[in-house]
Amino acid sequence: MLITTVHGQQIEINNIDTNHGYLLFSDKPVQIPSSFEHHCLRINLTEIDTIADYFEQRLRTDYHAPQVKFLYNKMRRELAGIALRHRNKRGLINIVGSVFKYLFGTLDENDRVDIQRKLETNAHNSVNLHELNDAIQLINDGMQKIQNYENNSNIINSLLYELMQFTEYIEDVEMGMQLSRLGLFNPKLLNYDKLENVNSQNILNIKTSTWINYNDNQLLIISHIPINFSLINTVKIIPYPDSNGYQLEYTDTQSYFERENKVYNNENKEINNECVTNIIKHLKPICNFESIHTDEIIKYIEPNTIVTWNLTQTSLKQNCQNSFNNIKIKGNKMIKVTQCKIEINSIILSENLFKPEIDLTPLYTPLNITKIKTVKHNDINEMISQNNITLYIFMTTVIIILILLYLYLRYVSFNPFMMLYAKLKLRKNQNQNTAQQIEMEDVPLPLLYPSIPAQV
């Protein structure tokens, strides 16, 4: 019985004439690969061993600290500026004046005193200059270590980058081998061998297997890539009581189809369950059945479909005819509605029954990714240099401050202990003044006018 109305609203009621203990219900079709392209990815195990030995040798000889090139160049420029300034300020005695007089014996007493003072100053400056040279030598040694540090850093950065790429390649191959045991394809293998017929739609349908060629010491990962697909109808198995009240003991919700005398589920996996395969092939099922303990049944098959079993005459309310006319139904029925709603024994059936009535907002923040950039070796070095700039500037500033402080203390003849001594001396004087004031408060003042007793 089919009742249709305008605007696509429809209610369909059909009799169920079966006595098997189950129903076969048509489900949506699935897309199944019909032809494949076979591809082989060859991995030379001998070459991998050679590369592994190369990295082992590099790690033994080239393991050094990270680079500090920026700090080294900065220190070179600052040191050149400091040496130039001190060389201009620290000249010897006047060659045209005092030395000329001394050589020819024309100096007088004033000249002698002036020359002696300059010679003493020059001797003192020579001592200071020797100490400065020691400091400069120490700095030069440190900068030489920094330069060696930088050279070794370039080597280790290159080594780490190459080792990272090689390790990632080995991990991808290993994952491909593990997934091939399950017949699955590792998408990361596409990084090493681009395949024309592989896309996001069929990548889950790619099957793989792993082989080893002992003669050439090669590992072969063979991919079966689907290039053509076909639509195949599927069916669901629905337990439904027979006339004696027994139904199939079955709880699965998968859909099945038959191809080349084999049964597969909707994920294209072969089914070996004899009960399921016989039902799909319309053979005599070898299954377990169970007794039901109810007089009648009303249950959902899909959001817009229900079935009834042994139903007594019942009134069905519906709005599929733009009115709420009741329909009397009885027995074993399958009821399906389209763009309308029915109600039977307080059970509401609608095509939109299971659609949410509230707005579900995701709890995560969507990521606006417009482009993914591949990071290259040069980019990695640049990022490392940029991240180290702050550290380099800080270290350079500290070293310059220490050098300036050293020069200031040496050549300005500033004694940092004088201020400490002055503070201690001032505090001692304040303590003495306080003690004298306390003693004065304890001594009683003299009486200028002695008291005279009163006479009566």
UniProtKB/Swiss-Prot annotation:
Keywords, A to Z, come to: Glycoprotein, Transposable element
| Keyword Flavoprotein belongs to the record | no
Q: Keyword Glycoprotein on this protein?
A: yes
Among InterPro entries, the record links this protein to: Envelope_fusion-like (IPR022048), Retroelement_env (IPR012014)
User: Which regions span the lipid bilayer?
Assistant: none
Annotated signal sequence is none
Q: Name the source's superkingdom.
A: Eukaryota
Q: Which positions are glycosylated?
A: N44, N151, N228, N310, N368, N388
Question: What name is this protein filed under?
Answer: Retrovirus-related Env polyprotein from copia-like transposable element 17.6
